[in-house]
Each structure stands twice: as C-alpha cells, then as structure tokens.
C-alpha cells in the first residue's frame, strides 16, 4: 500500500528538479506525482530521465499542454495521488532523506502532521500551534481522505494560503513532530513587489 504521495508541481526548473527528486527516498510505499505545468525548458525531459534512472513504477509524470499556474498544477497533483498521505515538495526545495523516512513512522492517522524546516539562511523554522509560518511552506503531511475535495484556487500566488485555510476550517487533528524534514527555498522572491502581489491575490479572492 502506498503510504505517502509526494506532489511536485513544476514549471521551468530543469536545473533544480533533479535535486528535489533525489531527496525523495526510493521505497515501495512512496509515490511521486510530478505535474509539469507547460514548461518551455527541458524540465519534462529531465523528469522522464529521472524516472528511468530510479526505475520506479510509482513515479507518475503528468504533462500539461499549457501553463495555467501553480494552483491548477497542485490540483492535478491532488487528483492523481494514491497515497494514504500527501505532501507537497516545491521543485526548488528538497527533503532531508533520512529525516523524511523517520517522519513516515509518525503518520498514524492524524489528519495533518507538521515538521520543521530549514530556510536559505540556515535558520530552522520550528512549527507549533501558534506559529505564523504554519501556512507558508511548512512540511505538512496531509491525510488524503481528510483533504477530500479541498483544492487550491487557480490563482498565480498565495494559492496554498487559501488551500490550508480551507483545511483548517474542517477542524483537523494535528501533530507537531519537531523533526527538520525539508529545506525550503525562502524567500523565493524576497521583493516588496512579490509581497504586494500576494496580498492583491488574497484581496481578489476575498471579494469573490
């Protein structure tokens, strides 16, 4: 039985996708679902090479004919997953492989299981109930049955913020492990313009 589906929405990351995939343990109970969102570089070819290299029957690659944004790509990932739990991996992020395997032992039916992460400057983000970082880039293993039909809005930025707000509205059971499982590429675009655009997306969504 597949325990975890690692979901990778990707667009034009041929130089970094290999690192992300190599960080995922090769195990019979782990599935990779990579959705190429209409890349114009060699990302799709790199994914196919990596699947052949791993010789992994649980490595699913889906190629979308045109770029529709990360929200849509995330939803295709969720629709295609088969594991008991799902976890997103940004194509420019990577797991700490041994810690990932330790984390799998803690998946005991809890709806959302959180793990700490490391960011670009080496800081460790410790996640807990009151942490504002819980919704941004956090390592969340999500029980797929609990996720149900919750999906990301098909917007260009901040789609995960709305997705996790939806999940929290379902009153999930939660656990915080303290394990550092992922390196998170943050800030991805540390400009004020990026922050302003993200807030604009949230405002537009609230008005719908």
Task: Name the predicted role of every residue range.
Residues 9-16, 39:
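Donor nucleotide-sugar binding loop of glycosyltransferases
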Residues 36-45, 66, 90:
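A conserved acidic beta->alpha catalytic loop
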Residues 86:
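Short aromatic/hydrophobic "clamp" motif used to bind/position activated sugar donors
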Residues 94, 100-125:
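Conserved donor NDP-sugar-binding/catalytic core segment of glycosyltransferases
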